[in-house]
């Protein structure tokens, strides 16, 4: 199952080969989804406790991690050991609306929600 997850979340196209060694750089020097890179790996450790605040990981907006997966790799040969999906609790309604006003006289409005309802309005003056 964990083999079905994709690569690290990397919306800023960070070149992993230019990232510092694990745990030695700032969070912006790693892929957003490379938590081991940012905070150090779990190799040769039987217990880890800590608290981390990562400004590049959000639960809302265009770069949200909701709907993505978290994967823990196991050593000595790194392989995907444990994974989970990050999903909102309960049912969440998502709506999007886009309004475009073009001078001298074109108005476009589009609305969509997760129930597949759509409203479109075009007015050309």
Indicate where each model-derived feature is located.
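N-terminal leader/targeting pre-sequences
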Residues: 1-124
């Amino acid at each position: 199952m964990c083999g079905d997850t994709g690569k690290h979340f990397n919306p800023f196209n960070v070149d992993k080969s230019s990232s510092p060694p694990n745990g030695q750089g700032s969070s912006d020097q790693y892929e957003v989804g490379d938590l081991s890179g940012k905070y150090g790996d779990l190799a040769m450790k039987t217990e880890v406790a800590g608290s981390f605040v990562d400004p590049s990981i959000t639960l809302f907006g265009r770069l949200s991690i909701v709907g993505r997966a978290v994967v823990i790799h196991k050593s000595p040969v790194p392989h995907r050991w444990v994974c989970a999906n990050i999903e909102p609790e309960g049912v969440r309604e998502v709506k999007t609306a886009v309004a475009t006003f073009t001078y001298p006289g074109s108005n476009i409005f589009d609305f969509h929600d997760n129930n597949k309802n759509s409203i479109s309005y075009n007015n050309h003056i």
